[in-house]
């Protein structure tokens, strides 16, 4: 259109020198018309251009977003390729091995043990050679160089320590099949005290032991503690307590006097007597008293002693040699404790169950090896101080004579059944003024608790020890035909007195709950005596009355017949024959 206008303009444009005004006017009018048309078309062109610009901007934004997405996709693809390459490289690497660090060398190398071989290898700069410890596990690369430090081994075999060798870095141990082996001590064991008998964790390939496993066979059979029982808590055994204190405490407290008089301290003490009369109680009080005496001598606030309470029947083992080994471990522990200057009591309760007379066995001859083992250990105590063996038994006639001879169990103390005076003393341990007493009983004695308690004890003891018709218990017939009537007092014990007081206390509690009458009464004690006697009516119910009589403290002529003289709770008939057996050695 512009070109057409230009042609038209050129066609109607007057010449340069034209003087025709009308022509010039026509030309100008045409110019004006053209300009007006151009002016009218200008907004439309502007709008078209603006729309085009917006369209181009929209296209540009879409292209930019697409370009960003492509860039992100490329980056993700690159990361995946890198990760896959690393995974491929990792999977293509040879496996890493493990070894045990032995020692570091001056040139920066290390000696290790791996694959059954001892090697000297290089150490990666990332590993601090000075931080590696004996027995520590290390990681190795394909060239068998140390590239990483690991932890100590935590699994392996259990072995028993026999002794530590002179260099302090090796030890002699024993495996479960009794084979002996020399092993190295890992760094953690060099800083702690280990003792023979401890269970250790062994890594068998490298020969290192790493830790003490909290499982010692001796601990399962030994109660290593100081009991809190004092002599003042034991009633009716004043003479026996004095004898055992002379045998146990004097040699420890006054060793110079014994040496001056050339007097050898006793190696052992045997406490024998019927059940429930205080044998175990005295043994526990010995350890407690020794601890207090140690404190007095040394000036310490609290003394220390050890009481190794051997659970005799649990010491027996069906495997040959196991019981003997356990006995050796027990005395090994005792020697170790005694070497520290601490008194040690090795207490064998129910001694006849372990150390029967050799040759008395029927189904086995285990005593033929157990007894010599104990004899060897007791004789070994001679060179040690502060170790005393105490045995307790109610069948001392079954213990091997070699154990009972002087020089082994030197002191033999019989723990008798309590008489009336001893029974009063025992009652006073359990029946005290601290207990609530019934107002009626207090009123009979002017409100005095002390007088009331003494009266209750006196009444109970008189009832227990009266040779009355109601206290008749047994009629025994001896082998020579003699007969004897035994009363309940003949079978009394400290344990029975404690049980009687316990019954009376329970009756007082029940009376308070039922009748709202608080306090212990003498009638409770008397009824408790009757109930206790009735519960013991089945005592002689055994196939061997002679063995039963020996355990109960009746020694002497052999008993062949027992007849009960008390009617049972269910009205059982009295007078039953009890047959004897030929072999009396296997009762226990």
Curated annotation (Swiss-Prot):
Residues 1-23 are annotated as: Disordered. ATP binds at residues 276-281. SUPFAM superfamilies: P-loop containing nucleoside triphosphate hydrolases (SSF52540). One of its GO terms (molecular function) is ATP binding. Pathway: Protein degradation; proteasomal Pup-dependent pathway. The keyword Thylakoid does not apply. PROSITE patterns: AAA. InterPro entries: AAA+_ATPase, AAA_ATPase_domain, ATPase_AAA_core, ATPase_AAA_CS, NA-bd_OB-fold, P-loop_NTPase, Prot_ATP_ID_OB_2nd, Prot_ATP_ID_OB_N. Residues 1-10 have a biased composition (Basic and acidic residues). Residues 47-94 form a coiled coil. Residues 587-588 are annotated as: Docks into pockets in the proteasome alpha-ring. One of its GO terms (cellular component) is proteasome complex. Pfam families: AAA (PF00004), Prot_ATP_ID_OB_C (PF16450), Prot_ATP_ID_OB_N (PF17758). Keywords: ATP-binding, Chaperone, Coiled coil, Nucleotide-binding, Proteasome. GO terms for biological process: modification-dependent protein catabolic process; proteasomal protein catabolic process. Homohexamer. Assembles into a hexameric ring structure that caps the 20S proteasome core. Strongly interacts with the prokaryotic ubiquitin-like protein Pup through a hydrophobic interface; the interacting region of ARC lies in its N-terminal coiled-coil domain. There is one Pup binding site per ARC hexamer ring. Upon ATP-binding, the C-terminus of ARC interacts with the alpha-rings of the proteasome core, possibly by binding to the intersubunit pockets. Consists of three main regions, an N-terminal coiled-coil domain that binds to protein Pup and functions as a docking station, an interdomain involved in ARC hexamerization, and a C-terminal ATPase domain of the AAA type. ATPase which is responsible for recognizing, binding, unfolding and translocation of pupylated proteins into the bacterial 20S proteasome core particle. May be essential for opening the gate of the 20S proteasome via an interaction with its C-terminus, thereby allowing substrate entry and access to the site of proteolysis. Thus, the C-termini of the proteasomal ATPase may function like a 'key in a lock' to induce gate opening and therefore regulate proteolysis. Belongs to the AAA ATPase family. This is Proteasome-associated ATPase.
